[in-house]
């Protein structure tokens, strides 16, 4: 049985596209970057922790596999997680305005017996120049809350994107091609 260790509705919807039966484990993992931890190491660690905590929660019944993922926006080495309030969301969007940033999504798959696999997908996203009015209207919509980097590419935030190189679904929170490949490889081993 496959489990998705995530509170993200978007990740649930994306995983459904793979037409693989799964159940959701709703858990909360502290997402705190360690001092001097590289952004890619941070997203890998958090994704792995989500999967491992999820596996511990379901136990060994029915040979479970648990999928965990984490997504962060990175600009000039600075990690933009989920904004804590509307003011921080506006600050993040102003920083991203007219710039190219990276969106890093790590996906970890673990199973009983310590078997594990992981993939990291890095996409480059360029934003158009945003006016203060555009930022204010978007922040007022509430959409930035709960989103890494304070935007949802699958929502109104897509209007800000002038260029994307990489995985659209990865920017959303679960890179489908790489996740499908990870699951297939895991089944073969």
Curated annotation (Swiss-Prot):
Q: Which InterPro entries match?
A: ITPase-like_fam, Maf-like
Q: Name one GO cellular component term.
A: cytoplasm
Q: Which GO terms describe its molecular function?
A: nucleoside triphosphate diphosphatase activity
> One biological process GO term for this chain?
nucleotide metabolic process
UniProt-listed CDD domains: Maf
- Tell me where it resides: Cytoplasm
Q: Which family does it belong to?
A: Belongs to the Maf family.
Q: What is the documented function of this protein?
A: Nucleoside triphosphate pyrophosphatase. May have a dual role in cell division arrest and in preventing the incorporation of modified nucleotides into cellular nucleic acids.
What protein name does the entry list? Nucleoside triphosphate pyrophosphatase
